[in-house]
């Protein structure tokens, strides 16, 4: 399994709206993507900084995450809440408890 780790930020005042967009638009779009196995979103409510970890069957699935048209359309909603992406990385899961 592979994890795609994405750093992000939005204004702390927009946290509730950012979470709503993630739950109602992003997660359903991810669920339609080939190889998708899960999504975890971690946020510091005081700063609006966070990390999204999406889980994928193969490295190739993780590599094309976000290129799917439904997912790209859902992600287009984030700029309205001041959302910006930072660095993105893909890692292989080697130990899980």
Regions found by a protein language model. Name each.
Residues 72-76:
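A common structural junction motif
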Residues 1-50, 57-69, 80-97:
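Short S/T/G/P-rich N-terminal loop/turn motif that feeds into the first structured element of a domain
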